[in-house]
Amino acid sequence: GSFPKYGNDDDRVDEIAEWVVSTFSSKLAKQHTYRNSVPTLSVLTITSNVVYGKKTGSTPDGRKKGEPFAPGANPLHGRDAHGALASLNSVAKLPYTMCLDGISNTFSLIPQVLGRGGEHERATNLASILDGYFANGGHHINVNVLNRSMLMDAVEHPEKYPNLTIRVSGYAVHFARLTREQQLEVIARTFHDTM
């Protein structure tokens, strides 16, 4: 539909995400805990977004039955259509004070979006993007700078990429060690090609 989608720096929907985190956190805080511990919350999935997605029916946002959920605090694959910075801004709005165990954002860019002037320019531009994310309240980010086509080739020809390491959701792994289903989920994620 034409409704607003999380991941596009649109307060109409980003405020719903903030509300969900705040409401869940406040309800969790009211529960009795073992040894009077302080409950904390995290927004991360490792790879459970694939497993839980397989067991869950369709959702109101258009996700089909059996499809993976978004990893961590990421927008659902392809929903963040207004560029890399808009996606980062949406995630940075989530209230970290209520998620002290972390808000995981696994973020992928194609190398060219960081500039065409060489490695130094790309590194400088990436550092600027990360500085902005942290200045806006972001805390935890995993960054991949690569092309989707390379991952697709690595699925078919893993022997060509024995050391291809990617960030998944809070951890790094050799791409070949993921299950095929997990590899395809990573490939389906948004690879930002615009700022």
Curated annotation (Swiss-Prot):
Chief localization: cytoplasm
Keyword Acyltransferase on entry: yes
Positions of transmembrane segments: none
Superkingdom field: Eukaryota
Glycine radical: residues carrying this PTM: G170
Listed EC numbers: 2.3.1.54
Molecular-function GO terms, alphabetical: formate C-acetyltransferase activity
Reactions catalysed, as given in the entry: formate + acetyl-CoA = pyruvate + CoA
Region of interest: Disordered: 54-76
Glycine radical domain segment(s): 71-195
SUPFAM superfamilies from the UniProt entry: PFL-like glycyl radical enzymes
Ranges where the PFL domain occurs: 1-64
Keyword tags: Acyltransferase, Cytoplasm, Organic radical, Transferase
Disulfide bonds listed in the record: none
Enzyme class, UniProt record, top EC level: transferase
GO CC, alphabetical: cytoplasm
Places the protein is found: Cytoplasm
Family according to the record: Belongs to the glycyl radical enzyme (GRE) family. PFL subfamily.
PANTHER family: FORMATE ACETYLTRANSFERASE, FORMATE ACETYLTRANSFERASE 1
Protein name in UniProt: Formate acetyltransferase
Protein encoded by which gene: PFL
